[in-house]
Protein backbone atom coordinates (compact mmCIF):
# COMPACT_ATOMS: atom_id res chain seq x y z
CA UNK A 1 0.00 0.00 0.00
CA UNK A 2 1.80 3.17 -1.17
CA UNK A 3 -0.22 5.44 1.11
CA UNK A 4 0.78 3.76 4.37
CA UNK A 5 3.88 5.88 4.84
CA UNK A 6 1.99 9.08 4.04
CA UNK A 7 -0.85 8.23 6.42
CA UNK A 8 1.79 7.69 9.10
CA UNK A 9 3.92 10.76 8.36
CA UNK A 10 1.13 13.36 8.24
CA UNK A 11 -0.26 12.64 11.74
CA UNK A 12 3.29 12.68 13.09
CA UNK A 13 3.65 16.24 11.82
CA UNK A 14 0.27 17.27 13.23
CA UNK A 15 1.03 15.86 16.68
CA UNK A 16 4.45 17.49 16.56
CA UNK A 17 2.89 20.94 16.20
CA UNK A 18 0.68 20.30 19.24
CA UNK A 19 3.82 19.92 21.36
CA UNK A 20 4.59 23.55 20.53
CA UNK A 21 1.07 25.01 20.54
CA UNK A 22 -0.26 23.10 23.57
CA UNK A 23 2.97 22.65 25.49
CA UNK A 24 1.47 22.99 28.96
CA UNK A 25 -1.03 20.15 28.51
CA UNK A 26 1.54 17.94 26.78
CA UNK A 27 4.10 18.53 29.53
CA UNK A 28 1.51 17.54 32.14
CA UNK A 29 1.50 14.03 30.67
CA UNK A 30 5.15 13.49 31.61
CA UNK A 31 5.49 11.46 34.85
CA UNK A 32 6.38 13.45 37.94
CA UNK A 33 9.62 11.58 38.56
CA UNK A 34 11.01 12.76 35.21
CA UNK A 35 12.52 16.27 35.46
CA UNK A 36 12.19 19.11 32.94
CA UNK A 37 8.68 18.37 31.68
CA UNK A 38 8.60 21.32 29.28
CA UNK A 39 11.94 20.33 27.78
CA UNK A 40 10.69 16.83 27.00
CA UNK A 41 7.50 18.20 25.45
CA UNK A 42 9.55 20.34 23.07
CA UNK A 43 12.10 17.56 22.44
CA UNK A 44 9.46 14.99 21.50
CA UNK A 45 7.67 17.55 19.34
CA UNK A 46 10.88 18.33 17.47
CA UNK A 47 11.61 14.64 17.09
CA UNK A 48 8.13 13.93 15.72
CA UNK A 49 8.44 16.85 13.30
CA UNK A 50 11.80 15.64 11.98
CA UNK A 51 10.53 12.06 11.76
CA UNK A 52 7.40 13.09 9.88
CA UNK A 53 9.43 15.06 7.35
CA UNK A 54 11.94 12.24 6.99
CA UNK A 55 9.22 9.69 6.35
CA UNK A 56 7.35 11.97 3.94
CA UNK A 57 10.40 12.70 1.74
CA UNK A 58 12.01 9.28 2.37
CA UNK A 59 15.36 10.63 3.51
CA UNK A 60 16.82 8.41 6.26
CA UNK A 61 13.25 7.16 6.59
CA UNK A 62 14.08 3.80 8.13
CA UNK A 63 16.30 5.40 10.75
CA UNK A 64 13.50 7.83 11.57
CA UNK A 65 11.01 4.96 11.76
CA UNK A 66 13.26 3.05 14.16
CA UNK A 67 13.56 6.10 16.42
CA UNK A 68 9.79 6.64 16.32
CA UNK A 69 9.25 3.00 17.29
CA UNK A 70 11.60 3.37 20.25
CA UNK A 71 9.85 6.59 21.29
CA UNK A 72 6.45 4.91 21.40
CA UNK A 73 7.96 2.03 23.35
CA UNK A 74 9.24 4.54 25.90
CA UNK A 75 5.74 6.04 26.09
CA UNK A 76 4.33 2.61 26.87
CA UNK A 77 6.94 1.83 29.53
CA UNK A 78 6.94 5.15 31.40
CA UNK A 79 3.34 6.37 30.95
CA UNK A 80 0.75 4.02 29.49
CA UNK A 81 1.64 0.71 31.12
CA UNK A 82 2.05 2.17 34.64
CA UNK A 83 -1.30 3.91 34.18
CA UNK A 84 -2.95 0.66 33.10
CA UNK A 85 -1.43 -1.24 36.03
CA UNK A 86 -2.65 1.47 38.43
CA UNK A 87 -6.16 1.24 36.92
CA UNK A 88 -6.43 -2.38 35.73
CA UNK A 89 -10.21 -2.24 35.29
CA UNK A 90 -10.12 0.78 32.98
CA UNK A 91 -10.59 -0.36 29.40
CA UNK A 92 -9.36 2.98 28.13
CA UNK A 93 -6.05 2.61 29.97
CA UNK A 94 -5.35 -0.68 28.18
CA UNK A 95 -6.57 0.82 24.92
CA UNK A 96 -3.83 3.44 25.25
CA UNK A 97 -1.21 0.74 25.83
CA UNK A 98 -2.25 -1.19 22.73
CA UNK A 99 -2.57 1.99 20.70
CA UNK A 100 1.00 3.14 21.38
CA UNK A 101 2.29 -0.39 20.76
CA UNK A 102 0.46 -0.44 17.42
CA UNK A 103 1.91 2.92 16.40
CA UNK A 104 5.40 1.78 17.32
CA UNK A 105 4.87 -1.58 15.62
CA UNK A 106 3.99 0.05 12.32
CA UNK A 107 7.15 2.15 12.43
CA UNK A 108 9.20 -0.87 13.53
CA UNK A 109 7.81 -2.97 10.66
CA UNK A 110 8.84 -0.29 8.17
CA UNK A 111 12.33 -0.05 9.70
CA UNK A 112 12.76 -3.82 9.55
CA UNK A 113 11.52 -4.07 5.96
CA UNK A 114 14.98 -3.01 4.72
CA UNK A 115 16.34 -6.45 5.57
CA UNK A 116 13.93 -8.16 3.19
CA UNK A 117 15.35 -6.20 0.23
CA UNK A 118 19.03 -6.78 1.00
CA UNK A 119 20.99 -9.29 -1.09
CA UNK A 120 22.36 -11.02 2.00
CA UNK A 121 20.04 -12.94 4.33
CA UNK A 122 18.87 -11.14 7.49
CA UNK A 123 20.32 -12.00 10.86
CA UNK A 124 18.42 -14.42 13.13
CA UNK A 125 17.70 -11.54 15.50
CA UNK A 126 16.08 -9.51 12.71
CA UNK A 127 13.97 -12.50 11.65
CA UNK A 128 12.69 -13.00 15.20
CA UNK A 129 12.13 -9.27 15.72
CA UNK A 130 9.99 -9.10 12.58
CA UNK A 131 7.35 -11.20 14.36
CA UNK A 132 6.77 -8.55 17.03
CA UNK A 133 4.94 -5.93 14.91
CA UNK A 134 2.59 -8.56 13.51
CA UNK A 135 1.75 -9.91 16.96
CA UNK A 136 1.37 -6.46 18.54
CA UNK A 137 -1.06 -5.19 15.93
CA UNK A 138 -2.83 -8.56 15.87
CA UNK A 139 -3.42 -8.55 19.63
CA UNK A 140 -4.56 -4.92 19.52
CA UNK A 141 -6.99 -5.76 16.72
CA UNK A 142 -8.51 -8.63 18.71
CA UNK A 143 -8.94 -6.44 21.78
CA UNK A 144 -10.35 -3.49 19.85
CA UNK A 145 -12.68 -5.76 17.89
CA UNK A 146 -14.24 -7.09 21.07
CA UNK A 147 -14.77 -3.55 22.36
CA UNK A 148 -16.76 -2.73 19.22
CA UNK A 149 -19.37 -5.33 20.16
CA UNK A 150 -19.45 -4.34 23.83
CA UNK A 151 -19.67 -0.59 23.13
CA UNK A 152 -20.83 -0.06 19.53
CA UNK A 153 -21.95 3.48 20.31
CA UNK A 154 -18.35 4.66 20.64
CA UNK A 155 -16.25 5.75 17.67
CA UNK A 156 -14.84 2.83 15.66
CA UNK A 157 -11.21 1.96 15.03
CA UNK A 158 -9.51 2.82 18.31
CA UNK A 159 -12.33 2.47 20.90
CA UNK A 160 -11.84 5.52 23.11
CA UNK A 161 -14.19 7.79 25.08
CA UNK A 162 -15.88 9.69 22.25
CA UNK A 163 -19.41 8.60 21.36
CA UNK A 164 -20.25 8.66 17.67
CA UNK A 165 -22.69 11.53 16.97
CA UNK A 166 -26.24 10.37 16.30
CA UNK A 167 -26.45 12.44 13.12
CA UNK A 168 -23.88 10.23 11.33
CA UNK A 169 -25.84 7.59 9.35
CA UNK A 170 -25.11 3.91 9.86
CA UNK A 171 -22.84 4.52 12.85
CA UNK A 172 -23.80 1.38 14.79
CA UNK A 173 -23.73 -0.83 11.71
CA UNK A 174 -20.29 0.49 10.78
CA UNK A 175 -19.04 -0.11 14.31
CA UNK A 176 -20.10 -3.76 14.14
CA UNK A 177 -18.54 -4.11 10.68
CA UNK A 178 -15.23 -2.64 11.84
CA UNK A 179 -15.36 -4.92 14.87
CA UNK A 180 -15.77 -8.02 12.70
CA UNK A 181 -12.87 -7.00 10.46
CA UNK A 182 -10.68 -6.24 13.48
CA UNK A 183 -11.31 -9.67 15.00
CA UNK A 184 -10.84 -11.60 11.76
CA UNK A 185 -7.69 -9.66 10.87
CA UNK A 186 -6.37 -10.08 14.41
CA UNK A 187 -6.78 -13.86 14.19
CA UNK A 188 -4.97 -13.94 10.84
CA UNK A 189 -2.13 -11.77 12.10
CA UNK A 190 -1.59 -13.71 15.31
CA UNK A 191 -1.81 -17.06 13.50
CA UNK A 192 0.28 -15.74 10.58
CA UNK A 193 -2.29 -16.99 8.07
CA UNK A 194 -2.97 -14.67 5.11
CA UNK A 195 -1.39 -11.98 7.29
CA UNK A 196 -0.56 -9.56 4.47
CA UNK A 197 -4.08 -9.70 3.04
CA UNK A 198 -5.59 -9.32 6.50
CA UNK A 199 -3.44 -6.29 7.32
CA UNK A 200 -4.25 -4.65 3.99
CA UNK A 201 -8.01 -5.13 4.38
CA UNK A 202 -7.86 -3.97 7.99
CA UNK A 203 -5.98 -0.82 7.00
CA UNK A 204 -8.55 -0.04 4.32
CA UNK A 205 -11.38 -0.65 6.80
CA UNK A 206 -9.86 1.79 9.29
CA UNK A 207 -9.48 4.29 6.44
CA UNK A 208 -13.20 3.84 5.73
CA UNK A 209 -13.94 4.67 9.37
CA UNK A 210 -11.76 7.78 9.10
CA UNK A 211 -13.70 9.02 6.08
CA UNK A 212 -17.15 7.96 7.30
CA UNK A 213 -16.94 8.96 10.97
CA UNK A 214 -13.96 11.10 11.84
CA UNK A 215 -13.89 13.40 8.82
CA UNK A 216 -17.52 14.56 9.29
CA UNK A 217 -16.82 15.12 13.01
CA UNK A 218 -13.79 17.24 12.13
CA UNK A 219 -15.68 19.19 9.45
CA UNK A 220 -18.52 19.87 11.90
CA UNK A 221 -16.10 21.17 14.54
CA UNK A 222 -12.93 22.33 12.74
CA UNK A 223 -11.66 24.27 15.77
CA UNK A 224 -12.02 21.33 18.15
CA UNK A 225 -8.66 19.92 19.24
CA UNK A 226 -10.42 16.72 20.30
CA UNK A 227 -11.90 16.19 16.82
CA UNK A 228 -8.51 16.92 15.27
CA UNK A 229 -6.76 14.43 17.56
CA UNK A 230 -9.30 11.68 16.95
CA UNK A 231 -9.05 12.13 13.18
CA UNK A 232 -5.27 11.97 12.99
CA UNK A 233 -5.00 9.39 15.76
CA UNK A 234 -7.09 6.96 13.73
CA UNK A 235 -5.30 7.90 10.50
CA UNK A 236 -2.00 7.10 12.25
CA UNK A 237 -3.42 3.71 13.25
CA UNK A 238 -4.40 3.14 9.62
CA UNK A 239 -0.91 4.10 8.48
CA UNK A 240 0.73 1.76 11.00
CA UNK A 241 -1.38 -1.17 9.78
CA UNK A 242 -0.62 -0.44 6.12
CA UNK A 243 3.10 -0.18 6.92
CA UNK A 244 2.86 -3.63 8.46
CA UNK A 245 1.06 -4.92 5.36
CA UNK A 246 3.77 -3.45 3.16
CA UNK A 247 6.50 -5.06 5.27
CA UNK A 248 4.74 -8.43 5.09
CA UNK A 249 4.46 -8.03 1.32
CA UNK A 250 8.21 -7.43 1.02
CA UNK A 251 8.90 -10.39 3.27
CA UNK A 252 6.78 -12.63 1.03
CA UNK A 253 8.39 -11.28 -2.12
CA UNK A 254 11.87 -11.77 -0.69
CA UNK A 255 11.09 -15.39 0.17
CA UNK A 256 9.75 -15.98 -3.36
CA UNK A 257 12.84 -14.49 -5.01
CA UNK A 258 15.10 -16.50 -2.72
CA UNK A 259 13.35 -19.74 -3.70
CA UNK A 260 13.44 -18.79 -7.37
CA UNK A 261 17.15 -18.04 -7.16
CA UNK A 262 17.79 -21.41 -5.52
CA UNK A 263 15.96 -23.22 -8.32
CA UNK A 264 17.84 -21.23 -10.98
CA UNK A 265 21.18 -22.01 -9.37
CA UNK A 266 20.29 -25.69 -9.18
CA UNK A 267 19.50 -25.82 -12.90
CA UNK A 268 22.57 -23.84 -13.94
CA UNK A 269 25.24 -25.79 -15.89
CA UNK A 270 27.81 -25.06 -13.20
CA UNK A 271 25.70 -26.67 -10.47
CA UNK A 272 26.67 -30.17 -9.30
CA UNK A 273 24.62 -33.05 -10.65
CA UNK A 274 23.52 -33.94 -7.14
CA UNK A 275 22.02 -30.47 -6.66
CA UNK A 276 20.15 -30.66 -9.98
CA UNK A 277 18.71 -34.03 -9.09
CA UNK A 278 17.17 -32.63 -5.89
CA UNK A 279 15.09 -30.04 -7.74
CA UNK A 280 11.53 -31.26 -8.41
State what each model feature region is.
Residues 1-21, 39-50, 56-153, 169-184, ...:
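Extended, low-polarity transmembrane helix blocks
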Residues 22-34, 155-168:
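Short juxtamembrane and helix-loop transition motifs at transmembrane-helix boundaries
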